């Protein structure tokens, strides 16, 4: 997507910092530096007080002295992490220079960084700015993710509505038109036939569009559930070939099926795999010149079986091959009978085949057409 | 199709009833009854005793599964084919467990619907064609 609103630039003014130190002078120094930067500061002079102030002040960052009477900095930090979990503000420990062990223990206790005393104001400001920015980015990202999932849910709901409220009437329109074309309510005049065929073709392409959008939505939402069953590839392919012949006959295109003596059996979701076969055959019909021959081949070897669809079409130009199998990857090829294309069909095929751990691919056959093939693992 | 029995078609959407009934007539089935909802379907079923019921799954008030249960209570041997649009495996399994003979995607092209119906009729009425005069 090109026009998503850019996240706002990071403005850290007014961010809240809790400074904890039993040494009042230290607190005054650090408070001075940070207020100057536009942060809001709260102070606590012990671990116990820090826990209380934290609850009321809800800081974006905590500066925590390690050595304090009462509970020390590490314990305070662990308590904060335990109480607030993921939502706990980042903690930066303040420690005397040279106490390398403190640094390690600080990280163990859940600190994100440390500052050595005596302070160098520039270092304090830079480190705090880094952590506050990081934290703000994380928050923004969380917000964005939440907004996006909400938007995605709305999209899914909308598409669900399309499913029921558009698909059913569209299939009725298409079915009624087809029946009238077959003279189910009496013989039609030439002009009536032409009109009814227009209605049929228009409803057919709308239905296909709605179906493909729905498929993409379902697959993207991770709802592609496979109901696998042992299936004969030859039988599956034969069914699709049979049903596609009518469509092909309109363009005087013939579909021939070539099968080996073997009858490979694969574990597939029949409805979904039939969709793949249908799609590849219908593409072949769509892009082949009128009167050509489409060959559907069932093949198998030791550990894989599948099928291939060959056509006499123009093939796919090399510079467009990367677009095949991608969402909305429409190519420059134009259907030879004015059919419609959403550019989603092959992307859906790829997703279905990959969900079966299979491969789908394409090759040009020496200037005389295209071949799409699907290969599926044989059950061991 | 040489099915001479009667079929009751239950769907809340008028255009679906129009489409399927025209398809049935086109396939040579002349005795077609229609009901727009579950409760009318049960009343009509009791009156006309159709040989086969084509029953929509998604209907307001009394859905297809409830209607199926009620029909099976009236006649446990009645042949019911569920009409679905998006095939929902779970619903279909439930329907089959409740005694449905098959399911048909009503968003399929006429030829496919006809074929699915013929398969069901072949498997459910192997021995004697209902409504057929004994030879």
What residues fall within each predicted segment?
Chain B
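Active-site beta3 strand of CheY-like receiver
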Residues: 48-54
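Alpha4 helix (beta4-alpha4-beta5 surface) of REC/receiver domains from two-component response regulators
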Residues: 66, 87-104, 108
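Two-component/phosphorelay signaling modules centered on CheY-like receiver
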Residues: 14-33
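C-terminal output helix
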Residues: 90, 108-121
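Receiver (REC) domain active-site loop signature in two-component systems and cognate sites
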Residues: 59
